Amino acid sequence: MLALGLLLALPTQAAEQRVYLVATMQLDGSSLAQSIFLHEPGITELEGCREAVRAGQRDRDWQRYHHIFRSDRFKGFSGHMQYRCAISDQQFSSWQDGPRYNRSYLIGVDEHSKLNVERTSSQAQCMTQLRALPAARQAHRFCAMGNQQIMP
């Protein structure tokens, strides 16, 4: 009984659900992509994220989830941006735009907008893991390089 009381007395901390904007630049005609995970503390609902995306695309001025697509870095190539709003209990280091997108991730956003990010050893390993999934799960996942860390 004492052991049970001690277990109940231990502080427990539920994982905090956060709303993220997953912004992905996909190089057209390839599997190469870069993704960033942006969090705005003032946005706590998916609809708030979606509205921020609509406003950012419409006004071409990202007041929320501030980022800049540097098309000048892709001379001779074409790519497109894809935005997904998602909820996750995972946390990521803050994003700083820079040249080192050297972390490979298998990223999933399911039909309920639940974000799951897994670190893989390489882009090739990520593609191997992705192809091993059933088709229904593959449809909600992709591989991308990032420069943020998954926080413990």
Report the location of each language-model feature.
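Bacterial N-terminal signal peptides
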Residues: 1-9
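Mitochondrial intermembrane space
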Residues: 14-152
